Amino acid sequence: TNAYLYGTRFITWLAYNWSPEHVVDWAKRDDGSHRSYRKDFERVFGQPLDDAWQEWIAFEREFQGANLESVRTYPTTTYQALTPEALGSVSRTYIDEETRTLIAGFQYPGVIAHIGAIPVDGGKAEQLREIKGPALYQVVSIAWDPESRTIFYTTDNYEYRDIIALDRDTGKEEVLLKDARIGDLAFNRADKSLWGIRHLNGYASLVRIPHPYTEWNLVKSFPYGTVPYDLDISRDGQFLSTSVGDIRGKHSLQVHAIEDVLLDDFEPEQEVNFGDTLPEGFTFSPDGKYLFGSSFYTGVSNLFRIDVETGEFEAVSNAETGFFRPVPIDNETLLAYTFTGQGFMPVKLTATPLEDVSNIRSLGAQTIAKHRVLETWKAGSPDDIDAESRIVARDNYTAGGNLGLESMYPVVLGYKDSVSVGWKFNFSDHIMLDSLSIMGAHSVDSDLPTDERPNIMIDYKHTVVSASPLAGTWNFSYARNGADFYDLFGPTKRSRKGNRFTVGFEKTMLSDGPKSSSLLFNVNYFSDMDALPR
């Protein structure tokens, strides 16, 4: 991740310091360019890459130093750390008032992702349950029922998502819904229902899961490109809050009366527009009067308080590295997470409304301001493309009938103790159901018998997509004097004189990571073979 972030900043700095056209010229491979990215960098930018990298580091220190000075124009928010070290990635968090612990999903190096509990007053964290299939940054979608002391959370978070109920005290676990594809969980204390967002075929839907959680009911499907996230429900069960992003990249925080939502009225009672910045993790205060959450509204992730009745919007933190996922204890005290180089650290702070918070400079915005041509570099809308005009044929698709040349390249192989040279040709269809590779080579060793000098290897894979028992990947291959690249080096030889015909089949029987099961078999026929060495 750090390498990705550093690379992104470096490329942006190149565009800022030189021009966007320089960056494009370096990325292109046209006449006059060099195969080596380092050599081509020097051609385009007029200096070695390592020198430019050091210049960027010096620039970055100065740039970020100025940003920190801007933040410090006004007093920064003080806080009390709840743990001696950071906890990596963290999910939404709840307070278990009975045990005075924070309940959340955690994922950090050296420890398997898990549902855990952290004492609010300090102390050793407790691991409650490992998470199957955690997400990298959000970790897990989680909700909490304090009355039954049940933790609801999701597994397989990058796949179809199961919803699990975990008893906080006994550790007993139950799968409620399998492959439900529902996340962003929120619990309604008034009727003990679970709410969430279900994703399918590119569309997001608001769903309600009534007790005892055996089925979900559709509440509202949203237009394509409109995605609600970070649901929360007030303690009295009257209001639902959600952040909403639209297809233009604009975001808002909305508050809805649950009674109206259930009557198919999704007109918000309150809406606060955040523009291009995301409203994240907004949750109701215990009395339902406020919503607390975070946003990069000032360029740094600060905490904000929104009056549910009036929509008044106030900053309650001035952070240097950012605060995230606030948990209101009351209207003045928050538990939250501050960002460190090792991940998120839980902290306690006072939510005092601030009159002034400084913005910081964005390198991207500075680059656009300096090079106005970037304002015209925008991706077009898919709606601008006439899909019908691009259809070249209408027919049933057959993978074998759509095989085309994918690549071709020379090969060097080892055959016994000699060297063979030749070519390999790879073919595949447009959606990679079928593939064919043909490799032909000839030994340069004139001492080999004539019938052993040619090397031929043909491999064809055909994927059957259907509900029949024959669905799976079929493999048909033939080798004549099979040769292998690694026979050029090691004492173990895989090359063999003669013919080999193979029919193989592979079928996935179970795919439920980390568990998987496959059926695999191969039938081989050999002829004119040398005896294998003992």
Question: Where would I find each of the regions flagged by the language model?
Answer:
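Outer-membrane beta-barrel initiation region
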Residues: E69, F106, S295, M345, ...
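Transmembrane beta-strand segments of outer-membrane beta-barrel domains in Gram-negative
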Residues: A471-R534
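A short beta-strand motif characteristic of beta-propeller blades
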Residues: T77-P84, E126-G133, K172-L177, W216-F222, ...
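A flexible loop/linker signature enriched in serine peptidases of the S9 family
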Residues: A86-G88, G105-G116, K132-Y137, Y153-I164, ...
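Beta/coil-rich, acidic/histidine-enriched accessory regions frequently appended to metallopeptidases
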Residues: N2, W26-T150, D156, R168
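Short coil/turn segments that connect the beta-strands within blades of beta-propeller domains
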Residues: E98-R100, E147-R149, A190-K192, D236-Q238, ...
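Conserved beta-strand position repeated across blades of beta-propeller domains
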Residues: Y94-I95, A143, A186, D232, ...
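Short loop/turn segments that connect beta-strands within beta-propeller blades
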Residues: P119-G123, D167-G171, P210-T214, I258-V261, ...
